[in-house]
From Swiss-Prot:
Heterodimer of an alpha subunit and a beta subunit processed from the same precursor. It is found in: Periplasm. This is Acyl-homoserine lactone acylase PvdQ. The keyword Hydrolase applies. It catalyses: an N-acyl-L-homoserine lactone + H2O = L-homoserine lactone + a carboxylate. GO terms for biological process: antibiotic biosynthetic process; quorum sensing. Pfam families: Penicil_amidase. SUPFAM superfamilies: N-terminal nucleophile aminohydrolases (Ntn hydrolases). It is an enzyme of class 3 (hydrolase). It comes from Pseudomonas syringae pv. tomato (strain ATCC BAA-871 / DC3000). Belongs to the peptidase S45 family.
C-alpha cells in the first residue's frame, strides 16, 4: 500500500509485488516529517504537524530501537517463517512455524487486508503510511551502515501498510483463533487421515499449544488500580498501570510520547507496529488495560452428514464445508523452496479446528471456531480516539460508540478524581438462556461450545452493537466511582466490593467465583489503606515493588506449624526446608531467601489436593477465602509431607544452596549479562508478576510479566507521572538502551516521565533529531 522509498537501493531484496489496496491510497501520500526528542533511557517524544508526519517519526524511532524485532514479526504475520527458518522450528511464542504460517496465510488474505484498510478513516491511514515511510527510511540508513547482527539476513525488507494491517489483525485474534494455531493447522477430515495421523512432533506441538493456551492470561495478564478523589491523598485521580506482557516478540511494549500541536498530546506505551498509544495518559486523564476473562470466540459442534464428513447438517439440511487452499513456501534441506499446499475447511461459523482427544473430527462431529474479533476493523480508531479524549466522558463515550477494544478491560481516572472501570470489549452475543439451550452443561464455561446444527444457536444480533453478533456496550459491565476500582484478570464481579457487578452473560463476566490471589491482595491492601488514611502515589508504587507474596499469609503459618510438630521420621531431611521457610521474609525480593523457592514448590504440588483448604471459598467473603492449610486432615498432611520432600529434592537437583537468594535465580539475560529481577508467579498473589522458563545453572529466565509501569496523578497544571519499561526501550543488545531501564527496575528506581515542553527540554539526556522524507 505504500510506494517504495526513492533514492535507496536494498541489495539482495526482492522487488515488491503490487499490493491489494495500493490504488486506494496513492493519492493520499505526501511528504512527511517529524521532530524526535529523546530523553532519559532513550524515550522518544515525537512531534509532527499531522498524522502522516507523526507516523513517520514513530516508525523511524521504532526501527532505530527495534528493527530486528519488527522485521521478525513481519515474517511471521506474512506466513513466511517456513520459507526462511524451516517448517519445524518455532516462533518466540513456541508456535510451530508451519502451523503459524498456515494460520497467517489464511487470516491475512489480500481481500481481508483490503477490507480492513478501506474501513480506516483518513487519520489512521495517514498514521500507518507515515509509519511505513519512517521505518523504511531507518531501514535504508541501517542497511548502509550494516544491519544489527540478529537480522543481517535476507528476510529483512522494507515494509508496507499491508504489513501493519497484518500485524494489527494478528493482535486481534490473540484472544481467539490465535490460541488454536496448531488445532487450526492440523484439522483434516477423517477420510484423508492415516490412523489419527498424529505423529510425535504433532503431539508435542499440541501439548505446547495446550500449555500456552492455559498461560494466555498469565502472559498477557495485568493489574490496574484507579483511585478516585474520596480516597486519593491529593483529592484527584490516581492510576497504577501494571500490565504483564511478554518481554520479547510481537507483544513487547514500546514507550513513547506523541504530539500533534493543538490536536494530540499523549504519552505511554504501544505494541509493535501500532502508531498510537495503548496504555498511557494525556493532559486530562490516564488509563490502563487488563486482559479480561470474557469470551471472544465460541466453538460450534458440527453434526456431520453421515455420507460425507466434509458436509454438516444445519437445520436438517446438508451443507458443504468451505474449502480454501493455502500454500506455504517451505525451505528444504538443500536450501531450495517448495510450495506446500493445504486445504482449510470451514463452516458458516468459521474454520474447523481439531484437537485429538479434545476436539476430534470424526465421522459424526467436527468443531468450528467463530472469532468475534475477525470483524473488528475498529481497533486502531478506538485507541486513537482514547488518546485524544479531553475528558473522562469523551473517553468513555468513544469506547461505547466504537467498540473496538478486542480482549481487555479498561480502567481510567481523570484530574477531577473520577475512577472508571469498563469491561467493554468484543464479545459474542450469547446470553445465559441461549447458552443453557444450546450447549452441553457437562462442558462448563471454560470453553463455550454451541450446537452448530441449529441456526437458532448462533450469536444474536443487536442493532445497538457496532458489529453484528456482538454485545452492545450498554449490556457490558462498567462502574464509575470516586473511591476506587481495581482489576487483576478476574471477572468484573469484585472490581469494588461495595458495588458488585453481577448478572451478566457468562460469556462476559461470572460472579460468585473465587478471586485470584492478586485481586485478593489488591482489595486487602486498599482496604487497609482506606482504614488508615488516604492512598498516595508511594502506596501504589509499593503495591508492585514491595513484592509481598500474598498467598504466604494464608498458608505459611500452617507450614511452619507442620514443621514444628508433624515431621516425624523425616525431620532431619526436612530440617533445611523448615529452617529456610522460617527465615523467609514472605516476599519475592532480590534478597529473599531460599525459603521462597521451597514455598513455590510446595504450593505447586498442593494445587492438586482439592481438600487442602481449612476454610473453603465463601462468595460472601471472597477477599479472605479460601484460606488455611487443613494439616489436621490425614490426606492433606500426607500430601504436604510428600510436597515438602519433593521440594527438597528439586532444590538440591537445581544446585541451590541455603545461601541462595531470589535475585541469584530469577534474571533477565535478553540484553546480554544477566540482571537480577524481583517479583514472581502471579498465582502466589505477587502483584509484580513474573513468568519464567528454566535457564542455565538453576536460574529462571524472565519471559513475561511486569512490562510498562506507570503511576499517574494530576495537579492544577496537568499530569504528574512516574514510570518504567521493565525490559528497556530497545531489543537490540548493542543499544545503550537495551538494559538501562531493566537495571533501574531491578533497583526499584522509578523515573519521572517528562511531559511538558519545559520538562522535556530540561532533561539531562535531551537530544533532538529532525527527520523528513
Amino acid at each position: 500500500m505504500s510506494r517504495a522509498l526513492p533514492g535507496f537501493l536494498f541489495a539482495g531484496l526482492s522487488v515488491a509485488v503490487v499490493l491489494p489496496a495500493q490504488a486506494l491510497v496513492a493519492h493520499e501520500q505526501k511528504a512527511a516529517g517529524a521532530e524526535i526528542r529523546r530523553t532519559g533511557f532513550g524515550v522518544p517524544h515525537i512531534v509532527a504537524d499531522d498524522e502522516r508526519g507523526l507516523g513517520y517519526g514513530i516508525g523511524y524511532a521504532y526501527a532505530q530501537d527495534n528493527l530486528c524485532l519488527l522485521a521478525n514479526e513481519v515474517v511471521t504475520v506474512n506466513g513466511e517463517r517456513s520459507r526462511y527458518f524451516g517448517p519445524d522450528k518455532a516462533t518466540l511464542e513456541q508456535r510451530n512455524n508451519m502451523a503459524s504460517d498456515l494460520l497467517f496465510k489464511w487470516l491475512n488474505t489480500p481481500q481481508a487486508l483490503a477490507d480492513f484498510w478501506k474501513a480506516q478513516p483518513a487519520e489512521i491511514r495517514h498514521l500507518m503510511q507515515g509509519y511505513v515511510a519512517g521505518y523504511n527510511r531507518s531501514l535504508a540508513e541501517q542497511t548502509t551502515q550494516g544491519l544489527p547482527q540478529p537480522c543481517a539476513a535476507e528476510w529483512v525488507r522494507p515494509i508496507s501498510t499491508d504489513d501493519l494491517v497484518r500485524l494489527t489483525r494478528r493482535l486481534l485474534v490473540e484472544g481467539g483463533v490465535g490460541q488454536f494455531t496448531e488445532a487450526f493447522a492440523g484439522a483434516k477430515p477423517p477420510s484423508t487421515q492415516k490412523p489419527l495421523q498424529v505423529d510425535s512432533q504433532q503431539v508435542q506441538a499440541l501439548q505446547l499449544a495446550a500449555a500456552r493456551n492455559e498461560r494466555f492470561a498469565l502472559e498477557r495478564g495485568s493489574n490496574a488500580v484507579a483511585v478516585g478523589r474520596d480516597l486519593s491523598a491529593n483529592g484527584r485521580g490516581m492510576l497504577l498501570a501494571n500490565p504483564h506482557f511478554p518481554w520479547g516478540g510481537g507483544m513487547r511494549f514500546y514507550q513513547m510520547h506523541l504530539t500533534i500541536p493543538g490536536k494530540l498530546d499523549v504519552m505511554g506505551a504501544a505494541l509493535p507496529g501500532l502508531p498510537l498509544i495503548n496504555i498511557g495518559f494525556n493532559q486530562h486523564l490516564a488509563w490502563s488495560h487488563t486482559v479480561d476473562t470474557s469470551k471472544h470466540f465460541t466453538l460450534h459442534r458440527l453434526q456431520l452428514d453421515p455420507k460425507d464428513s466434509t458436509r454438516y447438517l444445519l437445520d436438517g439440511k446438508s451443507v458443504a464445508m468451505g474449502k480454501q487452499q493455502v500454500s506455504v513456501e517451505v525451505k528444504q534441506a538443500d536450501g531450495t523452496l517448495k510450495a506446500v499446499p493445504r486445504i482449510i475447511y470451514s463452516s458458516k461459523f468459521g474454520p474447523v479446528v481439531q484437537w485429538p482427544g479434545k476436539l476430534d473430527w470424526d465421522d459424526k462431529f467436527a468443531f468450528s471456531l467463530r472469532d468475534a474479533n475477525l470483524k473488528n476493523d475498529r481497533v486502531l480508531q478506538q485507541w486513537y480516539a482514547m488518546d485524544q479524549a479531553d475528558s473522562l466522558k469523551a473517553f468513555q463515550d468513544s469506547v461505547h460508540r466504537i467498540q473496538g477494544i478486542p480482549w481487555v478491560n479498561t480502567l481510567a481516572v481523570d484530574a477531577k478524581g473520577q475512577a472508571l472501570y469498563m469491561n467493554i470489549s468484543v464479545v459474542p452475543n450469547v446470553d445465559a438462556v441461549k447458552l443453557a439451550r444450546c450447549s452441553d452443561p457437562r462442558i462448563g464455561t471454560e470453553l463455550i461450545v454451541l450446537d452448530g446444527s441449529r441456526s437458532e444457536c448462533n450469536w444474536d444480533v443487536s442493532p445497538e452493537a457496532a458489529q453484528a453478533g456482538i454485545y452492545p456496550s450498554s449490556r457490558q459491565p462498567q462502574l464509575l466511582r470516586t473511591d476506587f476500582v481495581q482489576h487483576s484478570n478476574d471477572s468484573a464481579w469484585m472490581v469494588n466490593p461495595a458495588a458488585p457487578l453481577k448478572d451478566f452473560s457468562p460469556l462476559i463476566s461470572q460472579d460468585g467465583q473465587p478471586l485470584g490471589q492478586r485481586a485478593r491482595f489488591a482489595l486487602d491492601r486498599l482496604s487497609s489503606l482506606e482504614k488508615t488514611g488516604k492512598v498516595s502515589v508511594e502506596n501504589l508504587q509499593a503495591m508492585v515493588m514491595d513484592n509481598e507474596v500474598y498467598h504466604a499469609g494464608q498458608v505459611l503459618p500452617d507450614l511452619l506449624k507442620f514443621c514444628a510438630s508433624e515431621l516425624g521420621d523425616d525431620a532431619a531431611r526436612l530440617a533445611p526446608l523448615c529452617t529456610a521457610l522460617k527465615a523467609w521474609d514472605g516476599r519475592a525480593d532480590l534478597n529473599s531467601g531460599i525459603g521462597f523457592v521451597y514455598f513455590q514448590r510446595i504450593v505447586t504440588s498442593m494445587q492438586a489436593v482439592a481438600s487442602r483448604w481449612r476454610v473453603v471459598f465463601d462468595p460472601q467473603n471472597p477477599v479472605h477465602t479460601p484460606s488455611g492449610l487443613a494439616i489436621e486432615y490425614p490426606e492433606v498432611a500426607t500430601a504436604l509431607r510428600a510436597a515438602m520432600l519433593a521440594a527438597v529434592d528439586e532444590v538440591a537437583k537445581a544446585g541451590l544452596s541455603a545461601d541462595t537468594r531470589w535475585g541469584d535465580i530469577q534474571v533477565s539475560s535478553i540484553s546480554g549479562k544477566p540482571i537480577p529481577i524481583h517479583g514472581g508467579p502471579a498465582g502466589l498473589g505477587i502483584y509484580n508478576a513474573m513468568q519464567t522458563v528454566a535457564g542455565r545453572d538453576g536460574k529462571r529466565e524472565v519471559v513475561s510479566g511486569t512490562s510498562y509501569l506507570q503511576v499517574v496523578t494530576f495537579d492544577e497544571h496537568g499530569p504528574k507521572a512516574q514510570g518504567l519499561l521493565a525490559f528497556s526501550e530497545s531489543s537490540n543488545p548493542q543499544s545503550a538502551h537495551s538494559r538501562d531501564q531493566t537495571e533501574a527496575f531491578s533497583k526499584k528506581h522509578w523515573s519521572v516521565l517528562p511531559f511538558t515542553e519545559q520538562q522535556i527540554k530540561a532533561d539531562p539526556a535531551y537530544q533532538v533529531q529532525v527527520v523528513k522524507e
